[in-house]
């Protein structure tokens, strides 16, 4: 492993870099006050609103290119509304994971309340429309403001539920506990917990944050309209998807002759009956509603993928709820892609991967080797009835943790402040070893780079396959002490086969990509890979270490730079271009979730290069770290 750079001086509670425009300090008569961290407020509504405000502000700062202020107050001009927002800065992050206090409007009354999340959403939406010179700025605000309100309200409900029972259930597994930990959601998304169309009672049952669970809703599908595929094997023999479904359904179903069981999310089962194509199949007797049956399944962090401890498979169900930027219904090309990747790995690529990173448990992909769906009598897919059968590789003792869940702030029994499991692990390791929190955190980060990030880079370099390895798609495997020892990737949507490697991949698996729509131009692959693995995953983790006051971000940026330098020095043919890109490019392309939301884009629809809005941000590996690998700036006192 590369050596760690020397730990810099302790960083202050507010580390605020310089702001280039409108950087005057707030006037003394209307200066915001930091006070207690809003996320720790005992009132869950206040804590949830504070989280919503911070998410919106982080998005705005990143997507509009605001730099750091001179002092501890960030000024955000709102020309469309004729005012200025004064934002107290709790912590300024080189990687963008800033912490803010409640903002005020300049020149407002002294006793005016702080600006809440819903008001802030309206102000920022109006400003974005004004800057883009759109004619009706209020038209853009309607949907976003409603979804921000919904997200904040649901977050408050989740917080209240979790604070009443903060401990992990004794009957659960480490994997499920992590999946249920994302109480605040994506820290750089304006509406991370919005779930339009889900009632409060349904939300309690169907949400991982409330530790919900439910039996699956089953339908019987006539074989004449069944579509399915399987590369699932047991004892060397392929198991058909129909038999897998029968096994998961158990003995409680009474199937009509000539039909196959297909599981649905209970919310989707109700919604699908209102669709003309599905309703026609029910009316004609090609589909039969069997109702809920079997044991309870638990939603994972994606909400639509469900897990049952001890079951051989997880199920990725279609769910027409709009969650973050998309309605979460499986697409047929994604189902085929999961099977295709499983076959590709079994063609010898998985063995090469394991040989490159020997030792248990190593790194692998959580496979999606089978699926079931419904075609209409005309042979066209009936949307909303597609289900992926995913391997469940995790036993009850496997500490397999979704990275986003590991970094997420959550209540702990007997503690007044929110804290992540990462902070808990680092503190426990520091106490056990007698080392500083910063030293332990830095070593933990280096181990993560070598056990999780390096294998992902290898797959891109060796095979030309880039993974959409953002924090929610990436699982880190921990040893009993809490150190990273391996990793897993999951998601049949998130594969990028480089167009330049088409011939090589065809040689590995003839016909690859023909029906899965997985080959992507290299320039698009480079941009997406840099964002998902580089910005979202690793820089996001560095931001969490810093904003949670575990390790100075600049020290981890320097360590990451040294790791990338080593990774960029391998053989040319099998070297991923990502390390050099991150080391040498002064700016990076970054997904803009606020702008994506404002433009009403669905990330699962349309060409991969236009599904989301991307903006350009400064590369902190250059702006905060010198080429020698040492921190480039001194923190402000």
Segments and roles (model prediction):
Residues 464-470:
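Catalytic-loop of the protein kinase fold
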